[in-house]
Design a protein with these regions (language model features):
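Membrane-lipid interaction segments
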Residues: 2-445, 450-453
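Primarily a LysM-type cell-wall glycan-binding module
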Residues: 444-483, 488-502
């Protein structure tokens, strides 16, 4: 007879692309006639803003703008500032990308350089890094045996996995009227405004992804004495993102934030100075759902002739997700009396396999502006790295997301500049497994066992083995062997004398 099966559908999002692309943008700046000649450049700032991301057949097009500025010293040692916007377009290519591919994008600056072409012209070189994951809806039909005859023995196994089931986006604005703290030097001209939005709390409430976070502002500016100053401010925000599905408490949400624009205007008041702040942020939410996959990995019949049909398929299983925090405390030789400003740019990470795991390396570049013992403004760039280690089996894969914490800074020491930052690594480990499932078959019960077939077998086990294997070999059941021998475990130890009912 033909065995009956039911179709069970399992739906999720399948990641079809995991891409990364770095690209250098260049721009020449002409120093206006009203400004003095440049003697040397000190530091270049660049902050990325996303404008659009468009999925196409075979590619993902990401466009944006870099808010860039260059601080230079004139021949008298005074500080001068040039500002500009540098547009960028990156095309990430993959044959697996389609027009309907849903994307989650990260954008960062790898490095920002400035150099003099001549005393009236400056060249900016900015390297921008875009990382993207592409997802598409995927439905799998899993066959399960129904109304199985009592003589048909099944060995089923359940696998738990956390899979993405939905992505959604919400663009929102954060605005606030901020007070410059009392005692701070007045802001005359902004050199840079680095905005780092961070999610501090997120969860799912029905069909909404609710998030709370902080928009962290790091300002660099020139004061009334034309000296370089920094100021850190924070603006809390609370938002939600509408989802298509309605979720319970066992799902999680992962949110990736991108800055789409920043406006900051200093305003003088009778009591001091205020900052009119506004920013655009894009929240990219991914819902992660725990799912259980149950498969019949082996089967046999105690009677008749059983002809099974098997199907093998590869699955990607998420084994672990963890967050690690690592300090960044390197020091570099520099005759600095005070550090005026510091920018740290992370590069693309690299994974190093070890005997018992993997090390995630992130190269870092630190651009510093400081005053020397004579009070002159100097600048230096240093390179270092931060890493973290986690246990990982040889046949598993690891993915990481890196982020610098916003409260970092650099300090001058004895003949050195020390970085004092913290890094956060979000690690996930995966394993690809080829799993077998019973998808069809026939069972002919008219074929009877041989007449000389024994009713009981007595044997001693040579090695520890599962009762399932013994039962399958002698076409009996594991339960019958357990009952006859008063066993409680699914395996039997080596050297055990067994009574095997047939």
């Amino acid at each position: 007879m033909e065995l009956a099966f039911e179709q069970k559908q399992r739906s999720c999002l399948k990641r079809t692309a995991h891409l990364s692309l770095a690209q250098e943008q260049t721009q020449e700046l002409i120093i206006p006639d009203a400004m003095p000649d440049a003697a040397r450049t000190l530091i270049c700032y660049a902050e990325p803003e996303l404008q659009s991301k468009t999925s196409r057949a075979g590619s993902l097009l990401v466009t944006g703008n870099l808010r860039a500025s260059c601080l230079y010293a004139d021949e008298a040692g005074g500080l001068q500032l040039l500002t500009t916007d540098v547009p960028f377009t990156l095309k990430l290519e993959s044959s697996d990308l389609q027009e309907l591919t849903q994307s989650v994008v990260r954008c960062s600056v790898r490095s920002a350089d400035s150099r003099l072409i001549n005393s009236r012209k400056v060249l900016l070189r900015i390297s921008v890094l875009v990382q993207a994951d592409g997802y598409e809806p995927w439905t799998e039909e899993v066959r399960a045996l129904t109304d199985a005859p009592a003589c048909l023995q099944q060995k089923t196994q359940s696998y738990s996995n956390a899979v993405p089931v939905e992505t959604a986006e919400r663009a929102f604005q954060v605005s606030e009227e901020l007070n410059v703290p009392e005692g701070r030097a007045k802001i005359v001209r902004l050199a840079d405004c680095m905005l780092q939005p961070v999610v501090t709390e997120q969860n799912l409430v029905g069909s909404k992804a609710v998030m709370k976070g902080t928009a962290n502002l790091q300002l660099t500016y020139l004061d009334e004495q034309n000296e370089l100053r920094t100021l850190s401010l924070a603006v809390p925000f609370s938002q939600y993102c509408q989802l298509q599905g309605d979720y319970e408490q066992n799902e999680d949400v992962e949110t990736t934030l991108l800055v789409t624009g920043v406006q900051l205007e200093p305003v003088d008041t009778e009591t001091g100075q205020k900052l009119l702040f506004g920013a655009g942020i894009l929240a990219q939410c991914t819902v992660i759902q725990p799912q259980t996959l149950t498969l019949c990995e082996d089967a046999y019949s105690t009677r008749g002739d059983f002809q099974p049909q098997w199907q093998e398929q590869e699955y990607s299983m998420r084994l672990d997700a963890q967050t690690l925090r690592e300090p960044i405390r390197p020091s570099f030789p520099a005759q600095a009396s005070a550090v005026l400003d510091c920018r740290v740019y992370p590069d693309a990470m690299a994974l190093e396999r070890t005997a018992d795991g993997v090390i995630v390396h992130v190269p870092l570049r630190a651009d510093t502006v400081y005053t020397d013992a004579d009070g002159a403004v100097q600048s230096e760039s240093f390179r270092t790295e931060v890493s973290c280690k986690t246990a990982l089996d040889e046949d598993c894969a690891c993915e990481a997301v890196f982020q610098l914490q916003p409260e970092g800074y650099a300090a001058a020491g004895s003949g050195a500049v020390e970085l004092r930052y913290d890094a956060v690594f979000q690690l996930q480990s995966f394993a690809k497994q080829k799993l077998q499932n019973l998808v069809g078959g026939t069972l002919d019960l008219t074929r009877q066992p041989r007449a000389e077939r024994a009713s009981v077998v007595i044997r001693r086990t040579g090695a520890q083995q599962p009762l399932w294997d013994l039962a399958k070999r002698y076409r009996t059941t594991a339960q019958a062997i357990q009952t006859a021998n008063h066993l409680t475990q699914p395996e039997v130890e080596a050297g055990r004398l067994l009574l095997i009912p047939m």
